[in-house]
């Protein structure tokens, strides 16, 4: 299990696309630049959607664990 410090945690277990990414976007908006959000998810679509969100919105995907459920993603707010 990866150990990355996070400032906020977002549990999206049980939610299906597009809800997890919508919640990630809302959570990131409320955070300060440089803070890290840990996202916990079980929707297989997040393995594509979270990295895509980071690339499109220009936030840093610091780390991810997608080998087993629940998936975990660490996203650093860049701007």
UniProtKB/Swiss-Prot annotation:
Matches recorded under InterPro entries: Sulphur_carrier_TusA, TusA-like, TusA-like_sf
CDD domains per record: SirA (cd03423)
Family designation: Belongs to the sulfur carrier protein TusA family.
Role of this protein: Sulfur carrier protein which probably makes part of a sulfur-relay system.
GO BP annotation list: tRNA wobble position uridine thiolation
Active-site feature positions: 17 (cysteine persulfide intermediate)
Originating gene: tusA
Gene3D superfamilies: TusA-like domain
The entry's keywords: Cytoplasm
Localisation: Cytoplasm
A cellular component term, taken from the record's GO annotations: cytoplasm
Name by which UniProt lists this protein: Sulfur carrier protein TusA
Keyword Chloroplast: no
């Amino acid at each position: 299990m990866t150990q990355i410090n996070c400032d906020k945690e977002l549990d999206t277990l049980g939610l299906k696309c597009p809800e997890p990414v919508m919640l990630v976007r809302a959570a990131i908006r409320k955070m300060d630049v440089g803070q890290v959000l840990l996202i916990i998810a079980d929707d297989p679509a997040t393995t594509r959607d979270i990295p895509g969100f980071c690339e499109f919105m220009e936030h840093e995907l610091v780390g991810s664990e997608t080998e087993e459920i629940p998936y975990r993603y660490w996203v650093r707010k860049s701007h």
